[in-house]
Amino acid sequence: MTTASPQDIAARLGSGLLSFPVTHLRADGSFDEAAYREHIAWLGGHDAAGLFAAGGTGEFFSLTPAEVEQVVTAAVREAPEGLPVIAPAGYGTATAIEMARAAERAGAHGILLLPPYLTEAGQRGLVEHVRQVCAATDLGVIVYSRANAAYSAPAVAELADRCPNLIGFKDGIGNIEQMTRIYAEVGDRLFYVGGLPTAEMFALPYLALGVTTYSSAIFNFVPQFALDFYRAVRRNDAPFVLNALAEFVIPYCELRNREPGYAVSIIKAGMTVIGRPAGPVRSPLTDLDDAELAELADLVKKVS
């Protein structure tokens, strides 16, 4: 894709559905680049606004920094012209900066900054963490508010003032009051991403808060359904959305909730169901069993 400013990338990402591809692994757990690139090409035939390589759905937490760079590089090389590829950065500040620089080497068009690893920090510490990462790269940065990195409205406003390349805020907490406060303070200076697990569950009410897009993991294996659902959300078609929730999304979430970590495992199971297997999940995650796989297959038939 031709060189685009962080603001151009933000406008593109905020205008459509966001794809979070799985990372393909062989039986021995190694990265299967050929299969991954084929999947990226297949997803590129559908109308996503951006592709987030090696994110949470892509098992970022189980990949080494070198593997993350390899996955991002493969995504950049295979993604169709004009589709932004966003790379992850995370862990402590120093490691996140290294990963941001690796994203630049790989040719990524932006960065999703995941929460720091295994530590608690106050708002001053979180602001400084984001500020340092933003200062270390020319790429646009999207900050992910989740778990141990829950950003307050004043913190987000300060970051928007201090970091010209902070372009987006992804919410993985689901606090409606907090999102309302953030949008009231920051407004359209950032674009907003719904980032709760199976974000389709929250997409319609979040639209009213200025959240115009969300991370779709199910796009991996039911891309047309995911796009139809997103378009219904954007046109405020509540009857369509509610019917789709009842028919597929809610029972899918019930299956997802049976085991911790199934939010990722069930996506790879969906890939198996449609005949495009992506390999196993890495430990400590576990794959769905045969009975659960059959349940998922029945659900997929309803929307395929």
UniProtKB/Swiss-Prot annotation:
Pathway: Carbohydrate acid metabolism; D-glucarate degradation; 2,5-dioxopentanoate from D-glucarate: step 2/2
BP GO annotations: D-glucarate catabolic process
Transcription is among the record's keywords: no
Organism of this sequence: Nocardia farcinica (strain IFM 10152)
Protein known as: Probable 5-dehydro-4-deoxyglucarate dehydratase
Gene3D superfamilies according to UniProt: Aldolase class I
Lineage: Bacteria, Bacillati, Actinomycetota, Actinomycetes, Mycobacteriales
Family: Belongs to the DapA family.
GO MF, one example: 4-hydroxy-tetrahydrodipicolinate synthase activity
